[in-house]
């Protein structure tokens, strides 16, 4: 079993509104000669949580930190022109990111939650928002992370808005260990 010390949040660096799914990322990463999707989880714009690489496998998402981290990416990160970094997370993605991080923190309570930019100065705009959220570098504080994820939107309003619009339930994918990519 791997020792997980980091949960690294990424964006996929796609235009706002992209319909990219984990299968598309998997295909692209394989075209680069990788073993499959480098992220452990991907959150498309509709807020589903899609499983990429199995958690027990080393990811391919953050140089020098893959062996001890879980990689989570939301689809987006660029504005409509595809050139300018921007926080393009939908309300559904914000809710899903919060739920996923909360679940991961239950499994890996000592892991720190960081943005890709916090570990790699060559990626200053990934994930497109400030993961620190004004909090200390100790991201064990889930309440601080919740405020960062939702920004100006109170979590209750986001959850309520999603429910009022009849959005699907946000559930974790199964942790089937046979999905080795």
Model-derived regions: residue spans:
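Ligand-binding face of N-terminal immunoglobulin V-set domains in extracellular IgSF glycoproteins
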Residues: 72
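Basic/polar, cationic surfaces and motifs that engage anionic cell-wall
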Residues: 1-12, 45-49, 65-68, 77-181
